[in-house]
Amino acid sequence: MTGSNEFKLNQPPEDGISSVKFSPNTSQFLLVSSWDTSVRLYDVPANSMRLKYQHTGAVLDCAFYDPTHAWSGGLDHQLKMHDLNTDQENLVGTHDAPIRCVEYCPEVNVMVTGSWDQTVKLWDPRTPCNAGTFSQPEKVYTLSVSGDRLIVGTAGRRVLVWDLRNMGYVQQRRESSLKYQTRCIRAFPNKQGYVLSSIEGRVAVEYLDPSPEVQKKKYAFKCHRLKENNIEQIYPVNAISFHNIHNTFATGGSDGFVNIWDPFNKKRLCQFHRYPTSIASLAFSNDGTTLAIASSYMYEMDDTEHPEDGIFIRQVTDAETKPKSPCT
């Protein structure tokens, strides 16, 4: 099933995989959070699990603060910081409901969490302590850091753009250009916009500059749809990850496929083989050479028999990730 450019990690989580994140400066280490209440650190080239720590409920997201510190949150409402060298942990704080998103903003040096309690909280990683709580209009489903800005996707198809240096007011309030519930938002590495996916097999490419001439460039497209017996099956697009160098992006859907897209020329660059089950999370390494793919059943069809959850590590090439022609 897997070729010479791809392998499956040993010792995968024992339940659904919620998030995969590479270390900020190397493709050697991968952080993985899971519904089995664990966060795991893998040494990717060695194909071994280096460390595991627990929450008291399913872990919904994790992030590196720096190469030696992991942050994580989930259904137990707790935000933890774990020292990956000493295996010591610190309960940093809590939300009033499950923590859905954990991200680090290097430009402002804050950790950001988003919760189903309808707030975003900022955390000073040096102390560590809470550095502010900011109300959102609905439950937070997804968020992404773009330079010193924060893009938040909530229930009710709302999108909010915040300035992390001045959280006193919302910079922009938007509505998703897609008709159905938002599943994932990820910011372009060039900081000009973001990509948003929905549960209804669609992706939107959006721009942050509100001027009419820039807004004219935004568009949306259908993807992760399969014709079966002449009936189109439409799948949620669960995961997005950007290639830091080329500003192209990968999407993963509940159809088990990973696609790589060129947003400038509006083209699909490639599609990988079908994975055993839904793609729950994706992460490019910082240098863009490696893609981590979490194939993990997301209970779209209730608790039926399903393939084992797994993490695939794929070496990707420029041919798969680089825009084909000069972008005008």
Curated annotation (Swiss-Prot):
The modification N6-acetyllysine is found at residue 179. One of its GO terms (cellular component) is mitotic checkpoint complex. Gene3D superfamilies: YVTN repeat-like/Quinoprotein amine dehydrogenase (2.130.10.10). The keyword Calcium does not apply. SMART domains: WD40. This is Mitotic checkpoint protein BUB3. Keywords: Acetylation, ADP-ribosylation, Cell cycle, Cell division, Centromere, Chromosome, Chromosome partition, Isopeptide bond, Kinetochore, Meiosis, Mitosis, Nucleus, Phosphoprotein, Repeat, Ubl conjugation, WD repeat. It comes from the Eukaryota. InterPro entries: G-protein_beta_WD-40_rep, WD40/YVTN_repeat-like_dom_sf, WD40_repeat_dom_sf, WD40_rpt. It is found in: Nucleus; Chromosome, Centromere, Kinetochore. The keyword Nucleus applies. Has a dual function in spindle-assembly checkpoint signaling and in promoting the establishment of correct kinetochore-microtubule (K-MT) attachments. Promotes the formation of stable end-on bipolar attachments. Necessary for kinetochore localization of BUB1. Regulates chromosome segregation during oocyte meiosis. The BUB1/BUB3 complex plays a role in the inhibition of anaphase-promoting complex or cyclosome (APC/C) when spindle-assembly checkpoint is activated and inhibits the ubiquitin ligase activity of APC/C by phosphorylating its activator CDC20. There is a cross-link at residue 216 (Glycyl lysine isopeptide (Lys-Gly) (interchain with G-Cter in ubiquitin)). One of its GO terms (molecular function) is ubiquitin binding. It comes from Homo sapiens (Human). Poly-ADP-ribosylated by PARP1. WD repeats lie at residues 4-44, 47-84, 87-125, 129-164, 170-210, 217-263, 267-316. Interacts with BUB1 and BUBR1. The BUB1/BUB3 complex interacts with MAD1L1. Interacts with ZNF207/BuGZ; leading to promote stability and kinetochore loading of BUB3. The modification Phosphoserine is found at residue 211. Belongs to the WD repeat BUB3 family. One of its GO terms (biological process) is attachment of spindle microtubules to kinetochore.
